[in-house]
């Protein structure tokens, strides 16, 4: 373990703003502002202030520069000057992840706006409320291939929940209020607001609150009672039910209701990658995460179930495996606020469209009214599942070459930082190990890019989470591949006084790609060696120091606990720990892409035969 080299203290450390006491949907504030004549840019800033925004992540540029002038005078808005627009988008997403409030990012036209495409697609796929404000060339230049012109509305139409091109300054308050409402209501998502430069520079009439005009947008939040009653009947008749829980339970603030339903009925629970923390890992009914790298018990529960109670989940291919062999004997209750998700991948015997908290609350009342909980017979089912859980627990062994095990590092980090910390992962092996070996007890304590699988997500998302929760310990768990995509945002953290901590799982490779090459391409390791082991290029400790962080390195198991505690003791600047781990470590269990969940391997060459586990039930 190398000794830390502490960089000079940053010269500028603004106090972080806390979002703890802000309303989740501040657009509903009753405050009225009389008519005023402002520039369009001033109207943007005033609207954001009235909407309760406290932080914006962005970079100025020509087309959006008019907004930055009144921003300079705002006493309510903190602006975080990121080093790349992708960082702004992911930081806004991280902020929204942990608070449930809308995250805001801002960029100029052309390349500034196009650099937001990936984070907007990421937020949309994972149902994260984000509003991006982009400058655009003047209205008279649109369509002329003007300098830094890009049709960002057209580009982002397929990857956002909605987007706007503002054509009149008078529309700015209404459009921004609508954007926030759309982003945060129903199924949350990403919204883009594109504003031409001449609209920002021109005069407009400002008043607040504006009258929103969204006649075609009415999310159905109240579930149909008849459907809930039918769901209760299926639950009463089931003998092998499973609560299949997705990220919508967290987005819908329904985790307490989920626990009440689970404990009332005694039904086993599986939580998808996006739902880790929705149900406590310490709870005896929690079977863990299902899917490609899920627990054998969770996968077995879905495959052998006779009833799936799917709550706020979308039957993603990484959970279902080969769809026509997924849960072949199960009937399906599918509750989701987005009607487009119901029946999209799996037929629902009882579809329920509505807010998941309302669905669960009404379902609990229905079950109690009909005295159903005491009639569900699941002794054999639980005996079977406990047998699977006992036979195939999540585990890992030492590396054959004696190198540091990444699973050990992540497991120890989770134990030491504890359930009150927030963990943010990039994408790849380290993401899966963090999902598997850290025990999540609370919602919004686990952030990752689940749907889009965006490398480079962790550092900027952790930055956004730390700004939202300045009193919470925030760890970015990143791989050496992901880290090299967005590590420049550590300079932002150092300058802005955002003391995130980074556990860098450095295996010298694009680890997940290398694992697939090992399993499916005869160990032909084409273009996956990053040279971060063989040449130490870059030297991550030196890089961390150059970015204004403390840099640490750990290569031995006996040093892991000490170096984590050393990092935890540093709270005035960011810290990066370069964990040198084995290059050949692999993520298990695994269901190969495109195959049936029945073909899960607990470890390489070890395939559980679910029907042979006969402790009480086959």
Curated annotation (Swiss-Prot):
Thermal dependence summary for this entry: Optimum temperature is between 35 and 40 degrees Celsius.
Cofactor binding, per record: Binds 1 Mg(2+) ion per subunit. Binds 1 thiamine pyrophosphate per subunit.
Keywords: Amino-acid biosynthesis, Branched-chain amino acid biosynthesis, FAD, Flavoprotein, Magnesium, Metal-binding, Thiamine pyrophosphate, Transferase
Regulation of catalytic or functional activity: Inhibited by valine, sulfometuron methyl (SM), sulfonylureas (SU) and imidazolinones (IM). Pyrazosulfuron ethyl (PSE), promisulfuron methyl (PSM), sulfometuron methyl (SMM), metsulfuron methyl (MSM), and chlorimuron ethyl (CE) inhibited more than 80% of the activity.
Residues holding thiamine diphosphate: 85
One Pfam family named in its UniProt record: TPP_enzyme_C
Region of interest (Thiamine pyrophosphate binding), residue spans: 429-509
Region annotation Disordered: where it falls in the sequence: 1-30
pH dependence (UniProt free text): Optimum pH is between 6 and 7.
Family classification: Belongs to the TPP enzyme family.
Protein purpose: Catalyzes the conversion of 2 pyruvate molecules into acetolactate in the first common step of the biosynthetic pathway of the branched-amino acids such as leucine, isoleucine, and valine. Also involved in condensing pyruvate and 2-ketobutyrate to form 2-aceto-2-hydroxybutyrate.
Assembly notes: Heterodimer of large catalytic subunit and small regulatory subunit.
Protein name: Acetolactate synthase large subunit IlvB1
Organism: Mycobacterium tuberculosis (strain ATCC 25618 / H37Rv)
């Amino acid at each position: 373990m190398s000794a830390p080299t502490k960089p000079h203290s940053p010269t500028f450390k603004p106090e972080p703003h806390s979002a703890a006491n802000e309303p989740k949907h501040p657009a509903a504030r009753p405050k009225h502002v009389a008519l005023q004549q402002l520039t369009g840019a001033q109207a943007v800033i005033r609207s954001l202030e009235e909407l309760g925004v406290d932080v914006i992540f962005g970079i100025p540029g020509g087309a959006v520069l008019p907004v930055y002038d009144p921003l300079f005078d705002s006493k309510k808005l903190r602006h975080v000057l990121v080093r790349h627009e992708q960082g702004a988008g992911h930081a806004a997403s991280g902020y929204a992840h942990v608070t449930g409030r809308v995250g805001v990012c801002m960029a100029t036209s052309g390349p500034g706006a196009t650099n937001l495409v990936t984070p907007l697609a990421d937020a949309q796929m994972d149902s994260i409320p984000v509003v991006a404000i982009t400058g655009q060339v003047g209205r008279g230049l649109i369509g002329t291939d003007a300098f830094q012109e890009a049709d960002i509305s057209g580009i982002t139409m397929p990857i956002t929940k909605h987007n706007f091109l503002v054509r009149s300054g008078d529309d700015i308050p209404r459009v921004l209020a609508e954007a926030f409402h759309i982003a945060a209501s129903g199924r949350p998502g990403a919204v883009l607001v594109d504003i031409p430069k001449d609209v920002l520079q021109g005069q407009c009439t400002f008043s607040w609150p504006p009258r929103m005009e969204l006649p075609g947008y009415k999310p159905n939040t109240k579930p149909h009672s008849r459907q809930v009653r039918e769901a209760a009947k299926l639950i009463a008749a089931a003998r092998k039910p499973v609560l299949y829980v997705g990220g919508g339970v967290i987005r819908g603030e329904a985790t307490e209701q989920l626990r009440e339903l689970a404990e009332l009925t005694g039904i086993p629970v599986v939580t998808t990658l996006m739902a880790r923390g929705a149900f406590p890992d310490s709870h005896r009914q929690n079977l863990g995460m299902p899917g490609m790298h899920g627990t054998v018990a969770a996968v077995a529960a879905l495959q052998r179930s006779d009833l799936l109670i799917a709550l706020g989940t979308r039957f993603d291919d990484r959970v279902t495996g080969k769809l026509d062999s997924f849960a072949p004997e199960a009937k399906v209750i599918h509750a989701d606020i987005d009607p487009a998700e119901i029946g999209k991948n799996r037929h629902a015997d009882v579809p329920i469209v509505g807010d998941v908290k309302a669905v669960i609350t009404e379902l609990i009342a229905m079950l109690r009214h009909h005295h159903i909980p005491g009639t569900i017979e699941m002794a054999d089912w639980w005996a079977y599942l406990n047998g699977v859980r006992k036979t195939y627990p999540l585990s890992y062994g030492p590396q054959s070459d004696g190198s540091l095990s990444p699973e050990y590092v992540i497991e120890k980090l989770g134990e030491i930082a504890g359930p009150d910390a927030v963990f943010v992962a990039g994408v790849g092996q380290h993401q899966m190990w963090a999902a598997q070996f850290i025990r999540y007890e609370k919602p919004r304590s686990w952030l990752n890019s689940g749907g889009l699988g965006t490398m480079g997500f962790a550092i900027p998302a952790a930055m956004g989470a730390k700004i939202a929760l300045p009193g919470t310990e925030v760890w970015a768990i990143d791989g050496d591949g992901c880290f090299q995509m967005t590590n420049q945002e550590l300079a932002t953290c150092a300058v802005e006084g955002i003391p995130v901590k980074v556990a860098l799982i450095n295996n010298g490779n694009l680890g997940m790609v290398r694992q697939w090459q090992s399993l499916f391409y005869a160990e032909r390791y084409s273009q996956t060696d990053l040279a971060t082991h063989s040449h130490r290029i870059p030297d991550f400790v030196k890089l961390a120091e150059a970015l204004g962080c403390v840099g640490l390195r750990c290569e031995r198991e006996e040093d892991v606990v000490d170096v984590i505690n050393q990092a935890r003791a540093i709270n005035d600047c960011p810290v990066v720990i370069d964990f040198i781990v084995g290059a050949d470590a692999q993520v298990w269990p695994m269901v190969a892409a495109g195959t049936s969940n029945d073909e899960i391997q607990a470890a390489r060459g070890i395939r559980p035969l679910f029907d042979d586990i006969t402790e009480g039930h086959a």
